[in-house]
From Swiss-Prot:
This is Glycogen phosphorylase, muscle form. The record marks 156 as: May be involved in allosteric control. It comes from Mus musculus. AMP binds at residues 43, 76, 310-319. Its cofactor is pyridoxal 5'-phosphate. GO terms for molecular function: glycogen phosphorylase activity; nucleotide binding; pyridoxal phosphate binding. Phosphorylation of Ser-15 converts phosphorylase B (unphosphorylated) to phosphorylase A. The keyword Glycosyltransferase applies. It holds the Pfam family Phosphorylase.
Amino acid sequence: MSRPLSDQDKRKQISVRGLAGVENVSELKKNFNRHLHFTLVKDRNVATPRDYYFALAHTVRDHLVGRWIRTQQHYYEKDPKRIYYLSLEFYMGRTLQNTMVNLALENACDEATYQLGLDMEELEEIEEDAGLGNGGLGRLAACFLDSMATLGLAAYGYGIRYEFGIFNQKICGGWQMEEADDWLRYGNPWEKARPEFTLPVHFYGRVEHTSQGAKWVDTQVVLAMPYDTPVPGYRNNVVNTMRLWSAKAPNDFNLKDFNVGGYIQAVLDRNLAENISRVLYPNDNFFEGKELRLKQEYFVVAATLQDIIRRFKSSKFGSRDPVRTNFDAFPDKVAIQLNDTHPSLAIPELMRILVDLERLDWDKAWDVTVKTCAYTNHTVLPEALERWPVHLMETLLPRHLQIIYEINQRFLNRVAAAFPGDVDRLRRMSLVEEGAVKRINMAHLCIAGSHAVNGVARIHSEILKKTIFKDFYELEPHKFQNKTNGITPRRWLVLCNPGLAEVIAERIGEDYISDLDQLRKLLSYVDDEAFIRDVAKVKQENKLKFSAYLEREYKVHINPNSLFDVQVKRIHEYKRQLLNCLHIITLYNRIKREPNRFMVPRTIMIGGKAAPGYHMAKMIIKLITAIGDVVNHDPAVGDRLRVIFLENYRVSLAEKVIPAADLSEQISTAGTEASGTGNMKFMLNGALTIGTMDGANVEMAEEAGEENFFIFGMRVEDVERLDQRGYNAQEYYDRIPELRQIIEQLSSGFFSPKQPDLFKDIVNMLMHHDRFKVFADYEEYIKCQDKVSELYKNPREWTRMVIRNIATSGKFSSDRTIAQYAREIWGVEPSRQRLPAPDEKI
């Protein structure tokens, strides 16, 4: 029996997600039934909603495996250059819906589950996020995997299968509490363990110098077991692989010391080895020099390089070389991209393999290494740069330290030859930093050992060349490139905002989904009343849906007709959630001052996690919740102003809040946010941006036109000038009454009556040592926010500006980013050609 179709349901029949054929639906129902009984061993009397989710996941996965095997066979036959994306983080989120979107199965699965009396959306909500990342860097890696598959590149993501991903955030009494993220508790239907490809990784030991060369001996061995996850491209039958390594103790672990009777203890101690892949370090833009973290970094690199070389040697190309010891062709067959410095040990490890094991001479090995590796820089914050203590490396990786010293010696010889007599330049450029603690500067190692170095937005790449890597740019300018970040439009539009994807497809067709520049065609609809109405309607539906979600999950009631003002990202001083707080308090004080004056109602939502050891970030969360407690319970405010802290912000929550946002807050101090990618997601989903000229905001404003962007605040040059003059917060405090009032409220306990000095650390920081100059941008920010409210009063003009933003967001597809990496760094040509489906003849 079929349900009556609403207009919206009828429209789904012309969906961008592919039609549900009748055979398709009955086949899916049959497979669902089979998996429930034979894979999960449940019947409908005992099956839980989670069982139904797993049955659906296995049913969808069945459609992946044929394409996955086919793709790998295709790569073996054609032997293209392989791209290896090395990252300590892959922030994948959920997999079910993304797989259905990319395989055009969503409608059929929706219909099949409906016919079985189930709600697909409810089943999708059961899936755990794969939270193997902190924020932007890990999510970028995930978007890149999607684009590499969509562009038909023979690419592999390599990382660590953390047993515990980024912690779950609970807010208790306004404070962040962390809970372990046991995401594998119920199993993961998307991964396939590959124990047959387990590889040894060595630690500690010592170096023996023999007539044959150096030997690393007496090491401790940990095994790396790979788990493979399929990565489907968008409707091209390509399925690439993400391979994540899990640490396992070898069977003889601690037993070869055979201390009598120590058998039980030796088996219990296996945990120590297996701790390497236990947990993701929860630091974003902060370096913590812990031995376990260094072990993680070497673990992923050592296992991955063995795998890369095994695949190179057993390739069709490799097998034509009978002894397989010739690495001349290696850089033509292999590209290694280092996602930040975390996998930088790939450089000395590849050198160790080529020199110590494959017996290449140093110069040849170095040539191969440099031509193979490329490095992406993600931050200019000094506290985020990796600088490993020599004493740690000496103990853990003695041979690698020797190799780094040799690399450094030869590198500095080149510098000295290029800049004779410039001794200070040698000190600045050395890979080894002298000081109280001798350290290895991993960024310097990456630049020396790579043929390409890129920043992630135009302004960031310029800052690298002009400031932190200036010396290196002067030595080898040809190495430095820009690759502005992007986001995958599959997850960040089609999946999370089907209503908007549909409205767009009705005007310009569906091809934009894999060619986002086509959104420019929407510029001709900027005065089309029907389109304006449709875009506004979708936004309102998304806002209602998100309001219902907040009410259901968090029991908070919000006004869906208010302006949804959203700042979601990691909590960090440089991202300036505090500036947002100052605006909230300003609005509150204005309401209290003139309670009868009309004000555009706002719901201000802030979400994000603070690193567990980052005191100031945790205080910022407490401040946001404290402001909310005052504002949300003041009857004078009514529904004109609401402050919501979005607990446990993660990929799956981003997919809900971003489509509902009206205003996107991108307010970092100019020169601190390398790129940002949340900014792009909001732009694509029909929010307007208030932001500084920082990171990718600069290019977004350039694409949309500055008149369609709410730009405020100091530019990079202004910040530099202010630094030279000396930033003095007191000046702003004295000059701006509204600001002074806020600081007095924070100091006197207005927002913390039970503990009046609760926010003294925040006040002290803002007044005396604010590296990120919050007060310097306060006035312009408030004025700019007033302009936002003014425009919001005119819904038609607001929506026209939204359309201009959506139409010019095409540049920020990760497909464009990856096509540029492919052509300009990896030397491969992207392709949108489909592979034959598993049931098609090749």
